[in-house]
C-alpha cells in the first residue's frame, strides 16, 4: 500500500491533547511544614515535578498546580523531594488531583535514597486503580523507615492522557 498526499495538501496534525474532565474546586495550598510538623506540602515547581519518558509537565505557579500529560508506551513522571528538605521519612503521601480523561490507567511506585533507581511498592496501572477518574484524592502508604527520593506516577500505554496535580502532602 502506498499513501500519497496531494500537492498543496496540509500535513496531518497530531492528536489533540485531552480537555479536562469536570474538576473539583480550586484548593488553598500552603507549601512547607504544617504548624506541628506532621505534614509537609510539596511545592509544585519544575524541580519537584519532573518529566520522565513520554511525558510533558506544565507547572502553573499562580494556580499552584502541575499538569502532566502522557503520550506513549509506559510514560512516567516523578515527584522529587526538594534539596532543602532534610528529613524525608514519611508514612504516606496524599495526592489531590483531577484526571484529564476517564479511560486511561495510571500506577505508581516509590523510590528511596538507599537505591534511587529501583521502583518499590509498585501499584500497577488500572483504569479504576490508584488514580480513579471519579476520585480526586488518594492516600498511598510509604515505607516510613526509609528516606523518600522520588514518587513515580506512570501510565499504561497512554495516548494523550494525563491529570492535574493540585496538592502533594507527605505525612510523618
PLM regions with names:
Residues 2, 13-15, 19:
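Gram-positive cell-envelope targeting signals
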Residues 26-33, 39-41, 63-67, 93, ...:
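Generic alpha-helical hydrophobic packing signal
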Amino acid at each position: 500500500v502506498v499513501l500519497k498526499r496531494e500537492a498543496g495538501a496540509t500535513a496531518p496534525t497530531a492528536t489533540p491533547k485531552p480537555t479536562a474532565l469536570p474538576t473539583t474546586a480550586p484548593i488553598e495550598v500552603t507549601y512547607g511544614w504544617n504548624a506541628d510538623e506532621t505534614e509537609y506540602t510539596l511545592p509544585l515547581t519544575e524541580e519537584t515535578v519532573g518529566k520522565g519518558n513520554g511525558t510533558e509537565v506544565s507547572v502553573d505557579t499562580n494556580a499552584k498546580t502541575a499538569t502532566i500529560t502522557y503520550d506513549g508506551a509506559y510514560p512516567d513522571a516523578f515527584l522529587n523531594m526538594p534539596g532543602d528538605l532534610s528529613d524525608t521519612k514519611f508514612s504516606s503521601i496524599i495526592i489531590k488531583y483531577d484526571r484529564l480523561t476517564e479511560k486511561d490507567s495510571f500506577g505508581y511506585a516509590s523510590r528511596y535514597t538507599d537505591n534511587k533507581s529501583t521502583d518499590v511498592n509498585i501499584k500497577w496501572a488500572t483504569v479504576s486503580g490508584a488514580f480513579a477518574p471519579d476520585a480526586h484524592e488518594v492516600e498511598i502508604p510509604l515505607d516510613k523507615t526509609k528516606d523518600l527520593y522520588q514518587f513515580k506516577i506512570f501510565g499504561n500505554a497512554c495516548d494523550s492522557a494525563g491529570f492535574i496535580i493540585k496538592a502533594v502532602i507527605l505525612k510523618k
